Amino acid sequence: MKKKWIGICLAAAGCMVLLTACRDDAGRGPKDSGEVKTVSWNTPMEKDGRILLRLANNQKPDHPASEACDYFAQLVRERTDNRIQIQVYHSSVLGNEAETVKEVEYGSIDMARVSIALLTSYNQELLALQMPYLYKDEAHMWRVLNSGLGDKYLESMEEKGIEGLCWYGAGARNFYTSSREIRSPADLKDMRIRVQESSFMMDVIGTMGAIPVDMPYEDVREALKNGGIDGAENNFPSYASAGHYHEAPYMIMDEHVRIPEMVIMNRHVLEQLSQKDQDTIRQAAYESSLRQRELWTEYEREQWKVLEKVGVRVLYPEDKTGFREMVRSVYDMYGQPYEDILSEIRQMGGPGA
């Protein structure tokens, strides 16, 4: 398959050298006295050298996605007798999600765990998996991701130099606000709501009457503190673990979108490895996906207890019809090219989906 590679400037190459040379002192990556060879698209692999791959992750070390990434690295290390080591950098050490996607594309980082909201520029069809109020529940979403359709999307960016290794879940996204409760779509009018750095998500929130403000996840709490935004939208475990309830104590469980995540890898780096090593990495990634799903379920239970303890005001819409009506124009703007795919997704949800 023909690859479309983008040239890398000297600054990016220099950054890659620095990343390779700097060892992680926080215990996040493998520490070994033996020689470790870094693989990148412009660095040939030494036949007998060990290989260091870098994986970027924006979550804190105790987040389910982070623990799953660590598990992935552990499996690869064990199954290659320590010959291939994946060093995981948590807490946005290597940049925010949007930055790390580009770095994986360029080859200055080998892997990243990212929301697919940041991948639609590589394949617009990924929007079909993110449409508002599409899934009945989490089980419905996982049936889609584990189907042939999900496999197709993991492979859909290969011509852009990126391979999706596996899926991670990220729950359902809900609104939370600092000044007033959200009981209906009308309550969102003119509220400044933080969204992911995605034009699609800006349109989703904009059609619901709010003023979307795109910003990195790491900046949300400070913006809530200084009044730069009136609220945000995210899954409730992230809302709890980040402490956003201190500044935004009102949340409505409207579950407007479920946006899966991917562990992605630079395709050219992967192809430098033997077929056996490629298979090992793909299988380990798949097993980390299963582990992440288990961890996420437990994480939801733990973080819900946090919200109960601090007394967050949680509302449940009796009827989501009003919210669904508000986002109908999103389907007109984005869904028409993917009507067959959306129909297939709905069918996987069973009656009423």
Model-derived regions: residue spans:
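Bacterial N-terminal signal peptides that target proteins for export
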Residues: 1-9
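N-terminal secretory/targeting leader peptides
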Residues: 23-139, 149, 158-353
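Signature of the catalytic double-stranded beta-helix
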Residues: 143-155
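C-terminal motif of bacterial Sec signal peptides marking the signal peptidase cleavage site
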Residues: 18-21
